[in-house]
Amino acid sequence: MAYEYNEEWVPQTRLGKLVFDGQVTSMDEAMDSGLPIRESKIVDLLLPELEDEVLDINMVQRMTDSGRRVKFRATVIVGNGDGFVGLGQAKDVQVGPAIRKAIDNAKINITRIKRGCGSWECGCGLPHTVPSEVNGKAGSVTVVLKPAPRGLGLAAGGTARKVLEKAGVKDVWTRTEGQTRTTLNFAKATYNALMNTGTVRRPIVFDETEA
């Protein structure tokens, strides 16, 4: 079924046209298509329950020939609390436009993470934690996520907790290294760790019959 109520959006990409025409009706289908998401409206239509949260607003300055230029840099996390999460940042001379641009960038950067019950202490089989230990790095910050039993909660710092909540991870152990006071790198490292949940390598099982 095509999206008849969205006359203002004129899709510019192949995936956007497929979504607009109703040929792609879920974010899973969009991800499985192999086509890049380059329009934030795609995410608006496929994940209407998506929530966003501003992680950081910072003022940045740059000297030019005409003098000092000041802009605001916004860092935003978006997620549906059920396996989809995106991180974005943007700059503008005003805070409001910077936030809106960062939200759009976060939607374009949305990714599907893999969840499971990877803790040997649990075994419930529900997708409440990460499937195995993963790590992410950004700048000087390294974040390690470890599977935790159901009911433990998020043993994570403020910025990492917000990213994990938006991704739909309910229980996890974390370990951090580096300057975690830098919100941007802390958020990026956590986000990168979550992205790595989909690229976990399984251990090689040797056939004992081969000798």
UniProtKB/Swiss-Prot annotation:
Xref: InterPro entries: Ribosomal_Su5_D2-typ_SF, Ribosomal_uS5, Ribosomal_uS5_arc, Ribosomal_uS5_C, Ribosomal_uS5_euk/arc, Ribosomal_uS5_N, Ribosomal_uS5_N_CS, Ribsml_uS5_D2-typ_fold_subgr
Keyword hit for RNA-binding: yes
Any one GO molecular function term: structural constituent of ribosome
Keywords, comma-separated and alphabetical: Ribonucleoprotein, Ribosomal protein, RNA-binding, rRNA-binding
Record PROSITE patterns: RIBOSOMAL_S5, S5_DSRBD
Family, per entry: Belongs to the universal ribosomal protein uS5 family.
Record protein name field: Small ribosomal subunit protein uS5
Organism whose genome encodes this protein: Methanococcoides burtonii (strain DSM 6242 / NBRC 107633 / OCM 468 / ACE-M)
